[in-house]
Each structure stands twice: as C-alpha cells, then as structure tokens.
Amino acid sequence: MLENTNRTLTAAATRLRLYNTATHNTSEFKTVTPGHVGMYVCGATVQSSPHIGHIRAAIAFDVVRRWLLRLGYNVTFVRNVTDIDDKIIKKASENGQTWWQRAYIYEREFTEAYNTLGVMPPTVEPRATGHINDMVELIQRLIDRGHAYAIKSADGNPTGNVYFSVPSWQDYGALTHQNGNSDNNSDGSNGEEKASKSDKYNPIDPADASPDKHDARDFALWKAPCDFDQKDARWNTPFGAGRPGWHIECSAMSHRYLGDAFDIHGGGLDLRFPHHENEMAQTLAAGWKSANVWMHSAWVTAKGEKMSKSLGNGLSVPSVLAQKSAWVVRYALGGVQYRAMLEWSDQALNEAQSAYDRISNFLERAGRVIENQPDYAEVQGVDADNLPEDFTKAMNDDINVSGALAAIFTAIRSDNALLDDYAQSQNESQNDSIKSLIKTCVLQVRAMLDTLGLDPYSPQWRRNAQKSQDLCEDADNGASAEHKALESLIANQLEQRAIARAAKDFARADAIRDSLTAAGVVIEDCAQGSSWHLS
C-alpha cells in the first residue's frame, strides 16, 4: 500500500479504538493533529541476523499503519535502528569486526527481511549514531531541569557517566505501573504478565548496576567506555567521552521527527519495562509530551517459550523462507491480533498455505471472468467506508486481524457463489451485470488483503513472485512458470474434451472430465464454453 498526502478522512476513522498499555484499556483513537498520525516504532538492534520474532513485530505495526492509511489518515512512520550498543561491540570484537561494520551488515539483513515479507519502508529510519547531538542536547536539558546528574571523578573531571534520577520524577511507573523495585502488577492480559521488570526477557543494562548511582532505580543516559569497547565507539561530550545509554536514543529521535507530542509509540512486549518506562519518564521530564497511545505486540513462542537470540531458539528468516513462500510466512506471522501470543509450528505454516491457496484460487478464477485484474491504483482507491462492515468493524476493534481475515473468507465464499451463477447463466445481459459485480467484489477483497499486506497482485508481491517463482501470478498475464505449464496442459485437455463432445463421443468427454476432477481440477460448463479452477 502506497502513502500519499491527498487523503480524505473516512467516516470509519471516527470509530477506531486502540488498546493503550499505559491505561490498560481500549478507547477511541484521537490524533494530535486532525487527519495526521505520527507513529514511532522501536526498530532493530542490529547485532545479528533477524529472526521471525523481530519480523512479527514489524508486520504487526505495518498492519496498524496500513489500516490508518485506509481510514484516510496521513501517516508519518518513524522506525529507528540501534547501531551502537554493548552486544554489537562485543560480538564485533569476537568476530574480528569493527562495531560499525557489524551494524551495517545486519542492518542490511533486517532491511532485506522487511522487504521480502512486505513491510512498507518507514517514512524516516534514523540511526542512533546519526543523532548523537540530539541525545547530548536532551541529556543536558534533563540535567538543567534537575532530572539527571553527571558523575565526576575525585578530582572533579567528568567520567562520561550520566544517570536519570528516578526519584526526581514522581510519575515514574506511569506506563507499566511499577517503580523499578516492585513486582510487575499489570493485569496480565495477552501475556503481559511475562514481561516482568528484570528477567531473561528483559536484561538490565550493565551500566545501570553502577555503584555511582544515587538511587538503585536510576538508569544510564550516557555511558563511559567499558573495558570491551572499541576505541572509536565513543563520542566526546561535556559529560566526558562515551556513548548513549539504552533508552535516550528513542526519546531524542522521536522528538526530532515527530515533535513535542505524537500519537502512537509501538514496540515489542518485552520493551515495556524498562525501556519504554524509562523512555516515557525522560521524555516527560524534559518537558515534552509522551505518545498518546502506547502499543505493544506480543511474542512469537516455540513450545510456550519466547523466541529470542539470547535463549537460542529464534528461527532465522531465511530458514523459514526455505519452507514456504514469503506471502505464506507473512500470513502466518500476521494472521492473529497483535497482542496475542503466536505459537509457531508447522501447522501454522500449513494453515497459512491453505489460506493462500483459497485466496489465489478465487482471484485467479475471478480474473478469468473479468479478463484483467484491477490496477493496484484502483485497489488503493477503495477506502474503509467502501469495505464490508464486518471487516471494518474488526479492524477498528484494536486491529483485530483474526476477525478481519474471517470477513475476507466470508466475502470469498459469497463471491465464489456469484462466480457459480455466472458460469451457469446463459443470459448475456445478466452476465454483464454479474461481471461488473464480480469486479467490485475483487476490488473489495484485494483492498482488504492489501490492508493486511497480503494482496497477491500488489507491486511488492509481484516483485517477490519474479524472485521466488512461488507466489501468485503477476497482474498482467497470470502466473509463475509452473502455473503457465498447468494452464497449458489443462487447456489442451479441455480442447480435446470439446472435440469429443462435438463428435458426440460423450464417453471420452466424460473420461477427460473425470481425470481432471481426480487431479483436483473443477470443470464448469456454460454457454460461453468451459472454464476451470482448482478444487
């Protein structure tokens, strides 16, 4: 789905409701600026290759963005890249690389994975190292306002360590309702109880264990060089040489690109605490406003355990793509509501493959009737007010993708019945009317699919089809090499059957039909001739 700045807000936009982590409830979505959404999503820490857990989060917020666009909003979507941190430096040193070489290599891998799985490029994709000055200015602002302090050596020189003073900010804990010492007291819905303050899912920054802190809850804004740091992994500042803490970059970059106030801040569930809690505190303490809505996508799990690099159970994107097409993998990762845990299994992939087969069979069958698939621009032109009510209702209910998919398959069942009517009708005038209706149905189905990033005829999937030869046919003539070969074989069989019927050799005609049926090919005879589709 493409973005543009000529959108008109739909009536459906007024009914969008989103769950806010900070309030623990679902409420009407209202924007800071009418008709515009500012959205910041925490992106990758590019220490190593992406796994499907990373991509699930990216797909989840890609769908949120696509729905906002379909509702008629203009969207500024910012997704950062963390290209400097402890793990990047350590792993680079272990592998004989500079930290920036490693970051560059894996940033490209993430970008390739996003592109392959149909995630729209962000409006802005800032790197942490490109915004050091913004971070330094923010840290100084916090010091000046009494919410941060720089550590000095015994002789009064800056050490390079700066900490946020948690006791100075009385509203600390507003996001997750914990103060850094207490147990997590979230309501536990949709797996939130698993994102506790300090465990294997939420490792604490080593800099936060420093004895120099004034309070145990204080956290690092700027970090002095460590023993394992490479010499160029530091910047000179008034606080001393060092590099950014874990949390400061997102406050600095979201403010840089979205201003003092914006609409949505997103990220994975494991970022709730401490990352987003600390980010909210330092942003508010700087005198800026926090995001209106905080959204968190749940994890991909394997046997009930979160997939992660640190736990060693993450499935790489290439390994999954070796099993199924990118479209199928995206469906499997994005086919549930974003706050629901997603248990990964072969069954999930097989169900996604079945969904692809049902969708592509319908679109191919309908495409033969209307002769050409609608242009992608036409699909984009279908706004939320012109989609089936059950789809719009599901998407407006906190992006309920499961309900939206149910609406799509309901539409496909109805549309297949319409195609049956067309195949059986011998009334030319009636068929013209049905044909026009079928095109409208195809536009709606493709617009719904495109909202989920799953329109097989979109430019994204057409490019992937040329690359992998395992997706749907392209918009002009139809298909992969395999499908073209299948079409040729079936066309030959239908021609032989037509010759047999003309010669009144009905036994041979029936035998051809039976052999095709046994192979999973459904033949439909009508006044205009015979057509086929896969069962």
List where the protein language model places each region:
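Structural preference for alpha-helix termini/caps and helix-kink/transition segments
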Residues: 2-5, 306, 313-535
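N-terminal, positively charged nucleic-acid-binding surface of large information/translation enzymes
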Residues: 23-26, 32-120, 138, 528-532
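Alpha-helix C-terminal capping/helix-coil junction sites
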Residues: 69, 115, 143-144, 295, ...
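Short phosphate-binding/catalytic loops that engage adenosine nucleotides
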Residues: 73, 147, 521
